[in-house]
Amino acid sequence: MPMLSEGRFLSTRARSNRIVWFVLLFQVATSIVSQAATNRIRTAHSIGWYNTFLTFRLSDKSSIQAEYQWRREGWISNWQQSLLRIGYHVQLHPRVTARLGYGWIETFPYGDIPLNGFGKQFTEHRLFQAIVLQDEVKRLSISQRWMLEERWLGRYASAASTKEEDFDLLGRIRYQVRLQHPISKPGDGQGHFYIATYDELFIGFGKNVKENVFDQNRLAGLIGFQSRSSFRVEAGFLQQLLQLGREVNGKNVFQYNNGVTVNLYYMLDLRKRN
């Protein structure tokens, strides 16, 4: 694969910034249209997502990341979702990283209208491919991620079924933009604090996608601490707008989930040193 030159990469910065603003405006417009719709059922939940990310650096340009996300409803009381994911990352350019991997997800029934029509827990097996673009404007870090997912969701034949009889294949595209800015100067090996925000839009596609072509949108505001280069922790608010893939009484169902998220990152350097 031909490498991007630094000059050519930087020449796309203005266009990249326009794309960021266009997508943000699109997401805001989507949210406004969603709020204005009348043929809908609204539900709301308090959520807490508690996540751990471990990165094993294999070389200067490659790494493996394993993550577990403990997603709860009622802040911490009830299961919402369990997500285990592992991926391989390769750096194509100092500012461009490619990722691919696998995820195992368990989604649980919660709230008055569960995601599964029979009110059952279901399994999802997921493959993903992603491109991450990093940029900086002075001290502001800008990260954009485009992700493609192939999702196999467990399906029950009836309410009496005790296990999933089949798995339906669904496609999904995700776009995330994240902004991060330090709020303290790095000390001598002491690390620094920062603030960050991100927004991520999910769009479903494929013959098995029903009502939720607009799948969900996530918005977060965070404060974090970066210790040197190996450890990072951040926490803040999380808003999830999610559309169910089915109608209830002829109406679309939207979840308005608000809560907290806590993310812990740690990197292990496995590169061989002379």
Predicted regions and their residues:
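Transmembrane beta-strands of outer-membrane beta-barrel proteins
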Residues: 64-66, 98-100, 140-146, 173, ...
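Residue-level signature of outer-membrane beta-barrel architecture
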Residues: 56, 90, 102, 133-135, ...
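Transmembrane beta-strands of outer-membrane beta-barrel pores
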Residues: 68-74, 102-108, 135-137, 148-152, ...
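Short loop/turn motifs that connect adjacent beta-strands in outer-membrane beta-barrel proteins
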Residues: 60-61, 95, 136-143, 183-193, ...
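Outer-membrane beta-barrel transmembrane domain signature
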Residues: 147-244
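Membrane-embedded beta-strands of outer-membrane beta-barrel proteins
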Residues: 52, 85-86, 129-131, 175-177, ...
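Residues that define the transmembrane beta-barrel architecture of outer-membrane proteins
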Residues: 46-48, 80-82, 123-127, 167-175, ...
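Outer-membrane beta-barrel "beta-signal"
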Residues: 131, 256-274
